[in-house]
């Protein structure tokens, strides 16, 4: 599999930025809006946006159950920000009717870093990614409050991060990866390259 076909859930969020990042990282990338399109892809990116709105759109576009089924069957997936929330098995501070995919055994707190004005950037050490620390952009971002035994913690907010110091902001379980931050907006392709490598290896 030289250039795997990776879909980007194209309902909301930084779709174009993820498509560009995937193309730069050695994948052929395509927007996904219909259930039948899920069958053709080797991996899926779930972009940021507003998680409760995205969960409604998944139901409206009849993607929720087909996507859950593909994830159960081992489809590699990567979620950033709201995508992380949707991939979680448990979500705190969300609407009672919000749907999620349950692909990673973790508890996530929505908007944990605060409102838009509380958005910030930080340099992170990221497990499995070599080179300089990764510049991470957090926009009304979640953090992870609990992970299951099979979940690998990939990054935490550094000690210089104030009240958020030590909080988990990147995880992996099997072929599913999630980050609180938005690597698609910085030009640093290393998270997307890691995910494309995971897709190739499945």
Curated annotation (Swiss-Prot):
GO cellular component, one term: glutaminase complex
EC numbers on record: 4.3.3.6, 3.5.1.2
NCBIfam families recorded: PLP_synth_Pdx2
MF annotations from Gene Ontology: glutaminase activity; pyridoxal 5'-phosphate synthase (glutamine hydrolysing) activity
Subunit and interaction comment: In the presence of PdxS, forms a dodecamer of heterodimers. Only shows activity in the heterodimer.
Entry keywords, A to Z: Glutamine amidotransferase, Hydrolase, Lyase, Pyridoxal phosphate
Species of the source: Rhodococcus jostii (strain RHA1)
The protein, known as: Pyridoxal 5'-phosphate synthase subunit PdxT
Function: Catalyzes the hydrolysis of glutamine to glutamate and ammonia as part of the biosynthesis of pyridoxal 5'-phosphate. The resulting ammonia molecule is channeled to the active site of PdxS.
CDD domains: GATase1_PB
Reaction(s) this enzyme catalyzes, per UniProt: aldehydo-D-ribose 5-phosphate + D-glyceraldehyde 3-phosphate + L-glutamine = pyridoxal 5'-phosphate + L-glutamate + phosphate + 3 H2O + H(+); L-glutamine + H2O = L-glutamate + NH4(+)
Active site: 81, 182, 184
Binding positions (L-glutamine): 49-51, 110, 139-140
Keyword Hydrolase part of the UniProt annotation: yes
Transmembrane segments annotated in the record for this chain: none
Gene name per UniProt: pdxT
SUPFAM superfamilies listed in its UniProt record: Class I glutamine amidotransferase-like
Pathway: Cofactor biosynthesis; pyridoxal 5'-phosphate biosynthesis
One GO term (biological process): pyridoxine metabolic process
């Amino acid at each position: 599999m030289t250039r795997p076909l990776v879909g980007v859930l194209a309902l909301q969020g930084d779709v174009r930025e993820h498509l560009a990042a995937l193309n730069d990282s050695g994948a052929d990338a395509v927007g996904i809006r219909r259930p039948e399109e899920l069958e053709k892809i080797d991996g899926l990116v779930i972009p940021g946006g507003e998680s409760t709105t995205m969960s409604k759109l998944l139901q409206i576009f009849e993607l929720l159950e087909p996507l859950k089924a593909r994830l159960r069957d081992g489809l590699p997936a990567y979620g950033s920000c709201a995508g992380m929330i949707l991939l979680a098995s448990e979500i705190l501070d969300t609407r009672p009717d919000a749907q999620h995919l349950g692909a990673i055994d973790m508890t996530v707190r929505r908007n944990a870093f605060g409102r838009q004005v509380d958005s910030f950037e930080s340099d992170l050490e990221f497990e499995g990614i070599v080179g300089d620390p990764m510049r991470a952009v957090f926009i009304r971002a979640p953090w992870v409050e609990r992970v299951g035994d099979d979940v690998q913690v990939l990054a935490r907010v550094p000690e210089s991060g104030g009240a958020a110091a030590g909080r988990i902001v990147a995880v992996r379980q099997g072929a599913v990866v999630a980050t609180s931050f938005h690597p698609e907006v910085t030009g640093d392709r290393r998270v997307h390259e890691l995910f494309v490598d995971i897709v190739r290896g499945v």
